[in-house]
Swiss-Prot record:
Main location: cytoplasm
Residues that hold substrate according to the record: R21, Q22, A23, G24, R25, F40, D71, Y146, S201, H316
Taxonomy of the source species: Bacteria, Pseudomonadati, Pseudomonadota, Alphaproteobacteria, Rickettsiales
Record-level GO BP terms: protoporphyrinogen IX biosynthetic process
Name of the protein this chain belongs to: Uroporphyrinogen decarboxylase
Involved pathway(s): Porphyrin-containing compound metabolism; protoporphyrin-IX biosynthesis; coproporphyrinogen-III from 5-aminolevulinate: step 4/4
Subunit architecture: Homodimer.
UniProt subcellular location: Cytoplasm
Annotated family: Belongs to the uroporphyrinogen decarboxylase family.
Amino acid sequence: MTLISSPIKRLDNKPPIWLMRQAGRYLSEYMAVRKEVKNFLEFCYDVDKATEVTLQPIKRFGFDAAIIFSDILVLPHALGWEVDFKENIGPLLKQFKSKEDFKYLQDNSNDKLEKVYEIVKKVRKELPKSTSLIGFAGSPWTVMTYMLEGKGKQDFRVSKKFIYENKDLAKELLNFITEKTIHHLINQIKSGANIIKIFDSWAGILPEEEFKKFVIEPTKKIIKSIKGYFPDIPIITFPKGAGLLYEKFLEEVPTDIIAIDPLIPLEKMKLWSNKVTVQGNLDPVILLTNKKIIKEKIHKILSIMENKNFIFNLGHGILPETPPENVEFLVKCIREYEYK
């Protein structure tokens, strides 16, 4: 195995650490800022407040990377689509159903994303130079599912029925979102992000044929476009829940880093790390348990991934009820772990 130059730098031989949703509700300092803003989208566009909460986990835990505080649904919102977040419910969107809806999307974009790029610039200015800054977007497929369902966390029968019955319109919508995603990610890089992540939260709901069309192909297009402008920018992909199709994804998508969910065996991570940097994959629920369990699980991952191309992370976002002291303990376990 050839060790790949780590996209997130450290001066020692310990794996870099950052956590998905590391700026979030488990932190009291985050909640204090959140209470000052009326709604979640307003929070995402508030340059000072979004910068502050992006930096909070860096100041508290010393993570090796910051990820911009934002949301994957700022993209459809910036296309003029109706998006709202309801407390204890989650995202609610106007449901995409027709060619008329597609025409509306094409004609009603706004400049809301400029605030996101201002946030990236401000964070980069205030972040330690040694700390990486991750910009991100949702994958075209995952963003599509929210628009087709009108909300999150469904069984996705509406989305799947739509792409089976409306192949041409589904392809048009996918391509449109793909192009807008490319522009959004490139603008984040221009603003100071030095790593990009593509979150495909609902990749795992598709059969193989549709997985190739709606997950693999648009992701390849995004990466090719970004690399055309910024060949040295590392790109993290996350086809969450893809199971056996992770391997097909890795065969076809020229990703720099593959984020792994908790259901993928560690031995698979170890094998894949011979060709690509892997990131993951501690079950977020582990951080709700005790220090003995946390330490055992972390040490198991570290022992298997020793001397591999590896970034430590969770297999999904940190849970709101996570005790911050358990996150502190996680960082301590990784930093103090002695490799054999």
